[in-house]
Amino acid sequence: MLSRRAILAAGAAGLTASLAALPTLAAARKGFVKVEDGRLSLDGKPYRFVGANLWYGAWLGAPAAFGDHARLTRELDKLKSLGVTNLRVLGAGERSPAKVAMDPTFRGPGEDYDQTLLTGLDVLLAEMAKRGMKAVIYVNNFWDWSGGMPAYLNWTGNGTWFQQGDPAHPWPAFADYSARFYADEKANALFRHYVKTLVGRTSTVTGKPYRDDPTIMAWQLANEPRPAGSEEFGKANRPAYDAWIDGTARFIKSIDANHLVSSGSEGDMGCLGSEACVVESHKTPAIDYLTLHVWPNNWSWISMTDQPSTYEAGAARSRDYIRRHIALAKSMGKPLTIEEFGLIRDGRAFAPGSPVTFRDRFYRMVFDEVEADMKAGGPTAGVNFWAWNGEGRAQHADAWFKKGDRSYVGDPPQEEQGLFGVFDADASTLAIIRDHAKAVKAI
């Protein structure tokens, strides 16, 4: 098992000193989002935002045949026109045997990182800066659509490769496999080398070190890191999981003392269904704020095949989930962002402009909860809907992603292209987002 000493790696004394110095350093830097009195702030004022997930931003920004700088600027302009000022983006991607995954990726098992994609991230951040946007950059993934933790395990030979959704290895086999990552010292050494390179990077576009760029709001450890899929393995793996969150967050802060760090957790649905799990794994001062994801379809709270008869109960359960985690954030004295939420289209359609009756109701409900907590002076700083498809479109009649596709959308490769994402043709949803942005600005 990976020891706490191995995870911290850089030396406890140096990391502790770096962490202790963070508030002073961050406070002196204009334009950086920080934490004050359990809430996010920017230059002495509350930082509130309406955000979106644009995981593929670096791919669009890349100066290569697979990139599309012109589309990137159009998408950012459209998002800005809606009042979106915060984007959650992917800053990593690992080559893997996954049947459906992103290609190209930021890296393989060696240290020859893809400079074209890294330049794409430089371009994305520079374009966001022009529009006054902030970025949350996640640097790993629990799921295999970008390679993620399973790819690292595959490189180090830790067990047989498990494909997410493989009927030969039903749930929770994949999640238990991916969660082995936290205790794998070799896998984490590879991961930390990439993190050190990325966080310590200097932009090829602006010439500014990432650590000095206020466009970045936060570094995020991973997309939806879970301690396990099964309760049995989860209990055994919790010490490694908790130590990995604390150690990785401290490692990032030892490189960059100016930016916030978050975990990317879903909340207790991604922590063995336990609020205590969330508290224990996030009580470290190296984690600056809590994150929450709300997925009623994926969690079987609202049926994908019968939304009309299951929506009310599922929406009520989602509302309670949000409120419980707001209360949890208050009790911990930490800010909260609802950085993923979504609902499928009516009848599980995928086409742009197809009816989104229940999705629109769900968006309004989430936005109402956020606005209410903001008005009450609560810990909620903002939301990032999942996800922005914009002018991207499915390239195949069955709406499934195929290797080599370049019309990127927010729905990742393992899902139908259009399942949860918001297209530029979804007029009713765009209006709801725009109205929410106006309401947040008025608070």
Regions found by a protein language model. Give the residues of each.
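Hydrophobic alpha-helical segments of integral membrane proteins
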Residues: G14-L22, D268, L343
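C-terminal segment of N-terminal export signals and the immediately downstream linker at the start
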Residues: M1, L19-K30
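N-terminal secretory signal peptides and thylakoid transit peptides that target proteins
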Residues: M1-G14
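Active-site mouth of glycoside hydrolases
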Residues: F32-I302, T310-P335, F341-D368, D373-H436, ...
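Acidic-aromatic pocket-rim loops
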Residues: D306
